A protein has these predicted regions:
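Small/polar, glycine/serine/threonine/aspartate-rich low-complexity segments that form flexible
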Residues: 80-93, 287-288, 358-369
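C-terminal outer-membrane beta-barrel translocator/porin domains of Gram-negative envelope proteins
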Residues: 209-213, 217-338, 402-405
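Gram-negative/organellar outer-membrane beta-barrel architecture
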Residues: 74-221, 227-229, 297-319, 386-405
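Short basic (Lys/Arg) and small-residue
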Residues: 353
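Gram-negative outer-membrane beta-barrel proteins
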Residues: 38, 80-82, 107, 123, ...
Length: 405
């Protein structure tokens, strides 16, 4: 009995890419994992969309299956983005102004080149180049040169800090990322006031860093689901004999869940935990290694300044060890939309966060627990991370506004 083979209209026969006027085609094809000659898999199709969008160089990514063709349609974002630096520091309580340029698709290879700085207020400049996939399987290269000239807001001195980093990394599978960095850091005081007795006028370190990241988020900038786990270690070898070497260990975990609630658009619940531990003891650390538990980086709803904290908490704010966690509910207010190569959208956020700080690992205590809560907004623009403004409150009647990106 003869066997008749009928054509399979669900097979992917070819992949066509359209819209990449500047981006090299191999940059796009290496992100597409749907096999040719296999039936269409809608799950892989959605994952391919997310991988291309996560490159950060397209304002629109769409994949359609028509006539056995895997049709990839792209809208490239502007490659060169001017950066008007208008920044307010909660710590220095100063505005800074400057200008920069970001090339987010250098040579069409998804390389990010940035050059810019602030020239009024807190003065700094930075130049960086990042190639997330320079050769092989996700072998990356990143370099940063940074200089900052500023006043320390907590102690009476002015300093100049210089940082230079060379970093490379690779992937193991799609979710496991490893990075290795070698950097140089110098911190020199130009004026000296009332500082701790052991504080030196100059510090120089050679830093060895290692980062591991496990990432299953669907969209990096605004996840609907997935997890992000990371570990960072750093060993700083002092290049000056009378200064101590410094070791640092940190970890973080974030989880995202898309909820079903008819009164909100794409509501996402997330929670996270972060731990930071430094050695040697607090009294042997230089001032630039001190951490401050309140403010935009950790517990929102509090100041970064110890003297602005509620009575009884001052000594537990300027610390070297931190355990921090948060709960957030985020929902779309203005759906992200392509406005001619620039994507823009707004989300609303409700949050509760808490943290404990200590000067030694053995001194962690729930008696020092800080709790903050509030609401805010995230503004999504193609290219940079989202800009957020958060209005934080605490149980002691204080309120603070936190602006960050």
């Amino acid at each position: 009995m003869p066997l008749f083979l009928l054509p399979n209209n669900d097979l992917v026969d070819k992949i066509i890419i359209d819209g990449n006027k500047k981006t090299k085609e191999n940059v796009i094809r290496r992100e597409i994992l749907h096999p040719i000659g296999q039936p269409l898999d809608s799950l892989i199709l959605n994952e391919d969309i997310n991988r291309l969008y996560n490159l950060g160089i397209f304002s629109t990514v769409d994949i359609q299956f028509k006539n056995n063709t895997y049709q990839v349609d792209l809208v490239e974002s502007f490659s060169i983005i001017p950066d008007l630096v208008i920044d307010y520091s909660e710590i220095t309580k100063k505005w800074s102004y400057g200008f920069g340029l970001a090339h987010i698709n250098f040579f069409g290879l998804n390389q990010q080149l940035y050059l810019g700085g602030a020239f009024i207020g807190e003065k700094w400049f930075v130049i960086s180049l990042n190639n997330p996939w320079i050769y092989g399987d996700h072998v990356s290269f990143n370099t940063v040169l940074y200089n900052r000239f500023s006043d320390n807001p907590f102690y009476d001195y002015r300093f100049n800090a210089t940082y230079f980093l060379v970093e490379t990394g690779f992937y193991n599978g799609l979710n496991n990322k490893f990075e290795f960095g070698l950097s140089y850091y110098k911190n020199k005081k130009h004026t000296r006031g009332d500082v701790p007795q052991n504080e030196q006028d100059i510090y120089r370190y050679l830093n060895l860093e290692f980062n591991y990241q496990y990432d299953t988020r669907d969209v990096y900038k605004d996840p609907l689901k997935g997890s992000l786990f990371g570990i960072n270690t750093r060993y700083s070898k002092s290049l000056i004999n009378n200064n101590s070497d410094i070791s640092q260990l940190s970890f973080s975990l974030q989880n995202f869940f898309l909820l079903k609630f008819k009164y909100l658009h794409e509501p996402v619940f997330s929670y996270g935990i972060y731990g930071l531990f430094k050695f040697p003891k607090f009294l042997k650390l230089p001032i630039h290694e001190y951490e401050y538990l309140g403010g935009e980086d950790f517990v929102r709803g509090y100041s970064s300044f110890p003297n602005e904290y509620p009575d009884g908490f001052e000594k537990n704010i300027e610390v070297s060890n931190i355990i921090y966690n948060y709960l957030e509910l985020q929902s779309t207010i203005l759906k992200k939309k392509d406005y001619g190569k620039i994507e823009f959208g707004i989300d609303g956020v409700l949050f509760i966060n808490s943290g404990i700080g200590s000067k030694a690992i053995k001194q962690f205590s729930f008696d020092n627990l800080l709790i903050g809560y509030g609401f805010g907004f995230k503004f999504f623009i193609t290219g940079p991370p989202p800009i957020s403004i958060m209005f934080g409150f605490n149980p002691y009647g204080q309120k603070y506004t936190h602006l960050s990106n």
